[in-house]
Amino acid sequence: MSGLFAKLDPRRVQWGANWFAFRSRVLRTKPVESMLETSGGTGAHGTKLARVLSTVDLVSLGVGSCVGTGMYVVSGLVAKEMAGPGVIVSFIIAAVASILSGVCYAEFGVRVPKTTGSAYTYSYVTVGEFVAFFIGWNLILEYLIGTAAGASALSSMFDSLANHSISGFMINHIGTLNGLGKGEQSYPDILALVIGILVTVIVALGVKNSVGFNNVLNVINLVVWVFIMIAGLFFVSGSNWDEGRFLPYGWSGVMQGAATCFYAFIGFDIIATTGEEAKSPNTSIPYAITASLVTCLTAYVSVSVILTLMVPYTEIDSDAPLMEMFSLHGFQTAKYIVAIGSIAGLTVSLLGSLFPMPRVIYAMAGDGLLFRFLAHVSTYTETPAVACVVSGFLSALLALLVSLRDLIEMMSIGTLLAYTLVSVCVLLLRYQPEGDIHGFVNFLSEQNSKRKEGVLAECEKEACSPVSEGDDYGGVPTNTCGAKNLPSLGDNEMLIGKPDKSTYTASHPNYGTVDMSSGIESDETDSAYLLKLKKLLGPRYYTMRIRLGLPGKMDRPTVATGRIVTRCVVLLFILIFCFCSLIIFGSGQIADGQWWAVLLLVVLLLVLTLLVFIIIQQPENPKRLPYMAPCVPFVPASAMLVNVYLMLKLSTITWIRFGVWCFVGVLIYFGYGMWNSTLEITAREEEAHASTYQRYDMGVDDNFAVDDDLYPSGDQGPFQNWGKGGQQKQPQQEQSEPQSDGLDRLDNHRTSSSSSHSRAKSKASKPSPGFEALVVDDDLDDPLE
C-alpha cells in the first residue's frame, strides 16, 4: 500500500528519502575501528599523542582540578550563607551525588579507554553524532568558563594580598565595564588576561611538562592542607557547634548547600579526556576517578570541620575564608602560608579546566565536526597546540572582559548535562543485545530498512552478509559491515590496549569486554552486593526472582528487549525532568497539601518506579568489563535524578545564556559539521564507489537475462558466446533434468556469482575498466552445471 501511495505522489518519495538521510546523519555512530592505532605510526588525526600519564598523574589531575576552588572558596561560602557547620553534611551529600556519576564515567572509561574527548567520544560511539556534538560543544563551554573563572579567581587572590590596590588602579586609570559585568567594580582584568596566557603556554609546551607543574602545585597544596589541620587544632572551640548552631538553616539549607558543594567536585571528568595519553587507561581511569573523589571529599570535610570550629559561621569571610580565619585569632603568619596554598590550589584548578579543553576540541575537529585545522598536533610537543592556543586565548579574553561573578553562573550546566548523558549511555548499553551494543539507535532499524531501495541497499545488504574469512579467522562467520554498524574483530585489542589477562576477548564485536567462554561464569562474575544479598535471603532469593519476573542466568537480551529498555530510559528521563520540576517549583503547593500537587507527585513516583522495574525485568548483556558500575539500573537512574535536579536549580539567566550557546552550536553543526564529518566523507566515497558499478550496467543491454519467453526448451540460449578469450562454451543440460530445475540452478548460480563479484569489487583498489572487461575476464564454469 505504501508503495502505491509513493507511486501516486512522487513528493512523498522525496520527503521520505530526505527524512531518512537526515535521521541517518544525526544518529550515525563512530565506528571504533576508526580509532585503531598503528604501532609506530600516526594516529587518526596525524601525530599521535604521547602516552606519558601514569595513574598517579591522573589522580593528581583529578584532585587538582577539583580541590582548589572547593577548599579555598566553596567551603566558606556555603558555611556562611547556606548551611553553617552543616556544610560538612552538604559536602558528604554532594560527594555521594558525584560518585554516582563518577562510577558511570569509570565504566565508560574502561569501555572506550583509548580516546580523547571524554563524554563526547563516549556519546559518539554509542548514542549518535548530533548528541555527541551537543555534549562536546557544552563541554567546551564548561572548560572555557572554568579557565576564565580560574584566572579571575587568581587575580582576585593577588588583589586581596595587595589590599585591593590592583583593582583600584584599574578602575581609576582604565575604567569599568558596566555592560559586561555586575556593578561598578567590574573592570578590565588585565592581570587575569596575563595569567590565562601564561597557563596556556605551560599547557601547550607538552603534557609531561604541564603534568609535572601540576604535581608540584599539588604537593604545595598538600603541605598547606596539613598545616591548616595542625595549626587549626590550637584554635578550635566546641561552642561553635552548640545546640542550634550546627544546623542553623535547617535541612533545607543543607540541601541547598549540597547543590552548591556539588560544583566543588566538578572536574574529575578531566581524567576521562586523557585516555589517549594514559599508559594503562583500562585500569588507571576507574581507579583515578574514584581516588580523586575520595581525596577531595577528605579535604573538604576536614577543612570544613576546622573552619567551623575555629570561627562562628556568622563571622566567616566568604571571599577568603581560610586566610582570614587565622587573622581573626591574630596568627598573621599563617595567613600568608595559607595564601601560598590558595594560589597553588587555584592554579591547579585553572590547569584542570584548561588541560581537557583543547583535547575535546582536538577530538571534535579530528572527526570533522569542528574546523579541521584545530586537530593539528605539534610534532615537537605532541599536544594539540592549535586547539590549545585558540581555546586559551578565548578564555583569557573572557577573563579580561567578564567578571568572576558572571562567569561562575554559567560554569556547571554543561557538565551536568554531560554527566546525565553518560549515565543514560551506561544504562542503555547494559541491556542491548550483542549485535547492537555498538549502536543502540538500531531500534529504528525496522522502519529504516523499509526505506532503503536501489543499489546502495543491495550493496549494504551484501556487505553485511555473514561470510567466511578463510585462513584469517579459521572459517568463522563474521559480519563485514563493521564500518557502519558493528566494530570489527580487532576492536577489543585496540580499545583496551594490550590485554592484561587472557580473559579479554579478541574475537568478539563487544569491545572492551571479558570473554565469558574463558572460564568466567555468571555466578563468578556476580558483584559483591549480589553475593551478600544471596547469602542474606538464601533460597528465598531465587523464589523472589521468579515471582518478580526477573531474567534468569541464561537469558540474553534481544532486539525487542533492547528496544523496550531504550523507550523506558527515554520516558524515565522525561519523567525525572517533570518530577524535579515539581519538587523545585511546586514545593510550596506540596507542603500546603494541595490535592493536585500531591496526586501528581504520587503518580510520578509510581510511574518512575514502574519504569525502573520494567528495566530490571529485561536481561543484561552477559559480557563483563574489567570495571562495571554497580547496582545498575539504580546507580545510573539516581545519577540522572541528581543531575537533572541540580540543573533545574540554576538561575533563569544561566538557562538563557546556555540556550544562546547551544543555538550557535546547532548552526555550526548543521552548517559545517554534518557535511564535513569524517563519517559523511566516508559515506560519500562508498556511494561514489557503488555508483561506479551501477553506471557500468546502465548502458549495457543485458543479454544474459533468463526469461521463459526468450529461452524456450531446446534452444541454445543467449549464452553460446559467453567464454574466456573468445572461446565459446555451449551450455549443457542433462536430458533427464527438467528445464525448471535448470533455470533454478542458473538463478542460484548467478546470485552466488553476483555476491562473489561484489566482494571482489569492494576490495579492489581501482574501479573496473568496464562491464565488457568483466565478461571477457570471467572464468566461470558452465552456469547450468
Curated annotation (Swiss-Prot):
Disruption phenotype annotation: Morpholino knockdown of the protein causes smaller eyes compared to wild-type animals and aberrant light-induced locomotor response.
Here the segments flagged for biased composition (Low complexity) are 727-740
Any idea which GO molecular function terms this record carries?
Answer: amino acid transmembrane transporter activity
Name where it mostly resides. membrane
- Compositional bias annotation for Acidic residues: 775-785
Bilayer topology term? Multi-pass membrane protein
Subcellular localization is given as: Lysosome membrane
Q: Give GO terms for biological process.
A: amino acid transport; eye development
One term under GO cellular component: lysosomal membrane
Stretch list, region Disordered:
715-785
Read off the Pfam families from this record: AA_permease_2 (PF13520), AA_permease_C (PF13906)
Per the record's keyword annotation, is Transmembrane included, yes or no? yes
Q: Which residues cross the membrane?
A: 58-78, 83-103, 119-141, 187-207, 216-236, 251-271, 291-311, 337-357, 360-380, 384-404, 407-427, 568-588, 596-616, 628-648, 655-675
Give the keywords, sorted. Lysosome, Membrane, Transmembrane, Transmembrane helix
Which family, according to UniProt?
Belongs to the amino acid-polyamine-organocation (APC) superfamily.
Briefly, what is this protein's role? May be involved in arginine transport.
Q: What is this protein called?
A: Probable cationic amino acid transporter
